[in-house]
Amino acid sequence: MSKHSLQLVECPRDAMQGLPYLIPTQKKIDYFNALLQVGFHTLDFGSFVSKKAVPQLADTAEVLTGLHRGESNTKLLVIVAAVKGALEAVSYQPVDVLGYPFSVSPTFQLKNTRQTLADSLDTVSQIKEACHDAQKDLVVYLSMSFGNPYGDEYNRKIVLDQIESQLRLGIKIIALADTVGHATPKQVYELTSSVIQTFPEAQFGLHLHGEKSNWQEKVKAGYEAGCNRFDGALGGFGGCPFTGSERVGNLDTFDLFSWFDQQHLETGINKSHILNCAKMATQLFA
């Protein structure tokens, strides 16, 4: 197995957003400050979206005031779903990266952002401009990259066409998202290798969902296809609450770290810190 530098993205925002109870703001701050010391490339910790739609993350601005990076190089990422939220997000100096969910499935895009794909593409363009002006990065999460449960037309050409549309807007980082956890290792390998070969100018990540029984082969397939950016959430909690189908949890970031460590691949992760945070996650999400 060849070596290439790995970027692990920790997504407590994804783990929290669908919980039936609210986590106190101070507990979030304490947890995120601990995560900032682990060595993750990026921390996806909050969002500037409708507070009614995602009440769990309504305190993102307050959380930001309590975060202390110290010497951490971890980038702070927030999710936005509209231009209004993006303009608020870029006004906060500590925020490094905005993430926008753009779906291959038109049905899911309507469910998730209440926009058509055409309108969403216009939204991406405006958000990209706001990020450029504020010197922030923008990651597009390509939801339903491996198929959808709605019967919407799906094939690899549709995915490639959507990616090409994003790149024309100047997007440089795209995460292929298996939103409902249905992707097979074969699909992960074939699509990931295809997009990397077709669009060498972009960076592609994988935001996979899956069960404890099937995550490893998916990750191996993605890595062998050339992917070097992987999302996860400690404990494997979470899953998108807006799909209309049963939620499948995130990949457990500790499992990801352990697997890469066994392959003698460098992740930049501090083992004692990630162990401590894994214990915190168990208590926080219990």
Regions found by a protein language model. Name each.
Residues 1-286:
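Catalytic cores and adjacent flexible loops of soluble metabolic enzymes
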